[in-house]
């Protein structure tokens, strides 16, 4: 889930048009769920892989309406935009090439619906906290310090540092 929050220092200043420009090498259909959610469900031209892109806007203040596959946000104080995407591709290390569904997995429409519903209940701050926790767990596993003694050299003027280097 990608979460983007738009806000302003003054109330009622968020006026947005949200739409999705589909992949040009696919055939699909845009559907609307309520007045604040878009779903693009499509098949790629070259391999018929199904994919889905779902966009939901959650407003504080103002209004959201749907206009032919576009979400129109008017006079909102804040807008949270959630985006989910998925394909039906399934890794298969022992494929049966006679089976046309050998690489077809889960339904991307159902997956994106489940993910966006879960994210919608959390709010931006909780999503951000979960992102930090996930990110920190992955990227704080390693630390690297090069030449701790160099910290004292940072106080020296550049010309002295260059002289030491030569």
Language model: regions and residue ranges:
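Aromatic-residue-lined binding/catalytic grooves and analogous aromatic/hydrophobic interfacial grooves
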Residues: 1-166
């Amino acid at each position: 889930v990608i979460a983007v929050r738009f806000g302003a220092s003054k109330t009622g200043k968020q006026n947005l048009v949200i739409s999705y420009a589909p992949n040009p090498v696919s055939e699909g259909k845009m559907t609307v769920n309520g007045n604040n959610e878009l779903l693009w469900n499509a098949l790629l031209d070259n391999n018929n892989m199904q994919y889905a892109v779902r966009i939901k806007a959650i407003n504080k203040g103002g209004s959201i309406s749907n206009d032919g596959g576009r979400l129109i946000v008017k006079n909102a104080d804040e807008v949270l935009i959630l985006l989910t995407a998925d394909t039906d591709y399934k890794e298969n290390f022992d494929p049966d090439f006679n089976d046309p569904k050998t690489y077809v997995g889960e339904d991307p429409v159902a997956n994106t619906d489940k993910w966006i519903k879960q994210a919608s209940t959390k709010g931006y701050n909780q999503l951000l906290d979960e992102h930090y926790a996930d990110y920190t767990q992955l990227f704080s596993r390693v630390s690297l310090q090069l030449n701790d003694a160099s910290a004292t050299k940072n106080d020296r003027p550049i010309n002295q540092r260059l002289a030491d280097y030569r």
